Swiss-Prot record:
Annotated function: Participates actively in the response to hyperosmotic and heat shock by preventing the aggregation of stress-denatured proteins and by disaggregating proteins, also in an autonomous, DnaK-independent fashion. Unfolded proteins bind initially to DnaJ; upon interaction with the DnaJ-bound protein, DnaK hydrolyzes its bound ATP, resulting in the formation of a stable complex. GrpE releases ADP from DnaK; ATP binding to DnaK triggers the release of the substrate protein, thus completing the reaction cycle.
UniProt entry tagged with the keyword Transferase: no
InterPro entries for this protein: DnaJ, DnaJ_C, DnaJ_domain, DnaJ_domain_CS, HSP40/DnaJ_pept-bd, HSP_DnaJ_Cys-rich_dom, HSP_DnaJ_Cys-rich_dom_sf, J_dom_sf
Binding site for Zn(2+) 1: C149, C152, C202, C205
Protein name per the record: Chaperone protein DnaJ
Compartments (UniProt record): Cytoplasm
Length: 381
């Protein structure tokens, strides 16, 4: 598959200044960054494409080569001469870190020296009942992760020894493959990007500085969370390499469906059945809330589907904004399993509502059938 033009990738013209290129990169990096698009392979590919375009177009030598030869300038065996590995030189990762670190708090520092890599972030999916989500709860969870080896204190080296600076890249973690008049930055094949090598590894972790362990954590879930909310536990992710800081643990909340209530924002919704007689004559019906049962006054001649708002009976949002309401929908139940006598009484009642009294006693039915009659009259006229 052919590569897209680097200028097109960043959405800038060929006469764009370095400032314009950095501005375009910053915007696209935020849009497609993997932390913002977890599980989206398409976004990850676009992020890599944007990063590659930025690294080429902000380096004067690489940009000049690209402007003259296009993508062929960076292909192996592209006619620009051979070369070997070499340490030192410009660290293009520092350029990337200057921009990218401003956005996400990362980036390398310190004259191109390679830092040990921070531990990976972890995600834990937590399922809650509606009651737990609304009121808040503390949950104990077990998380399989990598922790610092306590035998070598995370260094990976045996006690009494230490990691040494890599002789191939001189601690940079990257080397340059020279191709004619420019160089391409690559991960050091000796230390695999770490900048250091361990000649006498720890027997416990075999030089990794980390080992597998299941951690038990107590997670406090604040009141008002909902499905999709994420709780960050700083430093509870995987331990970093060679004593580097640990990543974070993100607890992803999912609230189970409730058998009575549905939640929308800070409001709760429920359906309450009422009898045919109560809907017609009025009365009181018991309504469930998260705080207990309350009585709702049903007006006379209530139609099925009518909504009632009970203020302050919803959810207090986790981000503030007050307490939501409980929206109650009354559903008029049709009587079933009627006796002969009950059927006769209903027939008598229905007959008493017919004739001239139909409009008075059945306003919706009368309006519906008048509408149907008008519809067919219009079709035949």
């Amino acid at each position: 598959m052919s590569k897209r033009d680097f200028y097109e990738v960043l959405g800038v013209g060929r006469d764009a200044s370095e400032r314009d290129i950095k501005k375009a990169y910053k915007r696209l990096a935020m849009k497609f960054h993997p932390d913002r698009n977890q599980g989206d392979e398409s976004a990850a590919d676009k992020f890599k494409e944007v990063k590659e375009a930025y690294e080429i177009l902000t380096d004067p030598q690489k940009k000049a080569a690209y402007d003259q030869y296009g993508h062929a300038a960076f292909e192996q065996g592209g006619g620009f001469g051979g070369g070997g590995f070499g340490g030192g030189g410009a660290d293009f990762g520092d350029i990337f870190g200057d921009v990218f670190g401003d956005i996400f708090g990362g980036g390398r520092r310190g004259g191109g020296q390679q830092r040990a890599q921070r531990g990976a972030d972890l995600r834990y999916n937590m399922e809650l009942s509606l009651e737990e989500a609304v009121r808040g709860v503390s949950k104990e969870i077990e998380v399989p992760t990598l922790v610092h080896c306590d035998t070598c204190d995370g260094s990976g080296a045996k006690k009494g020894s230490s990691a040494e600076t890599c002789g191939t890249c001189h601690g940079h973690g990257q080397v340059q493959m020279r191709q004619g008049f420019f160089a391409v930055q690559q991960t050091c094949p000796t230390c695999h990007g770490k900048g250091k090598i361990i000649k006498d590894p720890c027997n416990e972790c075999h030089g990794q500085g980390r080992k597998q362990k299941t951690k038990t954590l107590n997670v406090k879930i604040p009141a008002g969370v909902d499905t999709g909310d994420r709780i960050r536990l700083s430093g509870e992710g995987e331990a970093g390499e060679m004593g580097a800081p640990a990543g974070d643990l993100y607890v992803q909340v999912h609230v189970r469906e409730h058998h009575i209530f549905e939640r929308e924002g800070n409001n709760l919704y429920c359906e309450v059945p009422v009898s045919f007689a109560m809907a017609a004559l009025g009365g009181e019906v018991e309504v469930p809330t998260l705080d207990g049962r309350v009585n709702l006054k049903v007006p006379t001649e209530t139609q099925t589907g009518r909504m009632f708002r009970m203020r302050g009976k919803g959810v207090k949002g986790v981000r503030g904004g007050g307490v939501g309401d409980l929206i109650v929908k009354l559903v008029v139940e049709t009587p079933v399993n009627l006796s002969s006598r009950q059927k006769e009484l209903l027939k008598e009642f229905d007959e008493s509502c017919g004739g001239d009294a139909a409009t008075k006693h059945k306003p919706k039915s009368e309006g519906f059938f008048n509408g149907v009659k008008k519809f067919f009259d219009d079709l035949t006229s």
